Amino acid sequence: AGSIAAYSVGITDIDPIRYNLIFERFLNPERVSMPDFDVDFCYERRQEVIDYVNRKYGADHVAQIVTFGTMAARNAIRDVGRVMGIPYQQVDAVAKQVPMELKMTLKRALDVSTELKRMYDTDPQVTELIDTALKVEGMPRHASTHAAGVVITPEPTDYYLPLATNDGLPVTQFNMTEIEELGLLKMDFLGLRTLTVIRDAEIAVQKHDPEFSVQKLDYDDPDTYRMLGQGDTEGVFQLESSGMKQVLVGLQPQNLEDVIALISLYRPGPMDSIPTYLRNRHEPDKISYKTPQLAHILDVTNGCIVYQEQVMQIFRELAGFSFGQADNVRRAMSKKKHAVMEAEREHFVHGCTDPGNECPGCVANGISEKVANEIYDEMSSFASYAFNKSHAACYAYVAFQTAYLKCHYPSEFMAALLTSVLDNTDKVIEYSGEC
């Protein structure tokens, strides 16, 4: 979405200049790895896109991508128990002592589960079971086809990659990461149900208003923003959770920038900044900046750092980094590479004279060392949570389309929405309450 070229030829619909989307966040000369290229389509027509790519580039130049499922803690215990011939009930009793938490490991489970540790210490068979499971935990357990990934190659795919077939279709035997390391073009063709809802609603509206098109919506429509400010967002993409409704009521969004910011903030981590964001929105005279140079970068988000692109702009405008340098530091911050972060702190504050990495630094640009370090600390703490504004803008664009349809064409929108969830009884009941 940050590409002016993509916008100009109609690949994307969001004006990157109007919303200050930085192309270098996607691709720049100093970026080592290839960027992700994710494209959402109506989920009923995703296969048409894959068929088109096969025709365009040749079936032998296109393959879907393998993904490997690995043995999680509980599965490792169950699989090892099966091989050891231990009755299933006994193995299951051990496996169930592993807490059901995201990224739980056997080592950590032994630390936090008193009962699992007791079984491990007192039962030799359980000791052998878990010791063996520890050795296979995390190993590949099965292969499947990635839900969206497709690789397109200049020469026939088997020139670069080992292939297998799944349901008659070629599938790489290298995973996403390995394909990226080879420098090959990886595309994610994603099916998004909401785009199908928008299409179906548009077709229904066109039956009585042939000139209607979602490509011609007024993205400054006050009625739509009034509806959002009332929290009437059941069925609206990205904005229908109860918590998001409360934030919408508190914010009273006035434009798409507000929606972009909310989608970026309403996630674990950045969510803690929402009270400050709302307070600054309604009391702008109380917003203060550590240095005047920050004002035009952060004014669109009420004085808060919200986007990765803002981190890059701060590096560029306060310390003279190139966008490529700025993106590399942002990546180091997001991955908490402390050695790199400390080296770059010195460059941010005092500049760098190394060939190819020259920058004047904040002090040379009239910012005190103390203030420069405070700004760097603030960026470091938030960079791991900051969201890609280009992604958020895409989400906000689709969110507005669904909100506009609900506001101005509620019958057509709700019919399309209900049709899309016919296989989900709870959702049908929930959305029927809106009709």
Q: Whereabouts are the PLM-identified features?
A:
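Alpha-helical scaffold/interaction cores of sigma-54-like transcription cofactors
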Residues: A1-C435
